[in-house]
Amino acid sequence: MDLSNLGNDIERVVVSEEQIQTRLKELAKQVEKDYEGKDLVLVGVLKGAVMAMADFSRHLQRHIDMDWMAVSSYGAGTKSSGVVRILKDLDNDILGRNVLIIEDILDTGLTLSWLTENLLSRGAKSVAVLTVLRLLS
C-alpha cells in the first residue's frame, strides 16, 4: 500500500502489510490443520473484513465456502450504542457447519460476542473468530 499520499495524517505504521500477510498465512495453515476433514464456512463481517477475508482465503490450500454479514452496534457516531442490528444477513444456511468469523478490527467485542451467539442459535456446529487487529483501550 502506498502511504506517501497520506502526508502527515499517519504518525507511524504499527503493523506492516508484510507482517499482516505473514500472520494470515500462518493462521491459514493453522485453520487448515484444525478443520481438516471438517465442513467449514468463512463468514466475513462487512465492510471492514473484505480485504482480510480475501487475503486470508488466498492463503488456504483448499476450497472453503464464504458468506457475508453486515452488523452494527454503532449509531450515527463512533461510540457503540450497545444494540446490535443485522444490516445484511447470510445467504446460506449454517446448520451443522463450523463457522469461522473473519473480522478486521476487534474493538469492544460486543458485536462479535453477539454474532457468535446468533450463529450458534442458528445451529452452527461451532463458531470461532479470526480478527486481524485488536484495539487496546
Where do the protein language model's features map onto the residues?
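PRPP-associated nucleotide enzymes
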Residues: 1-137
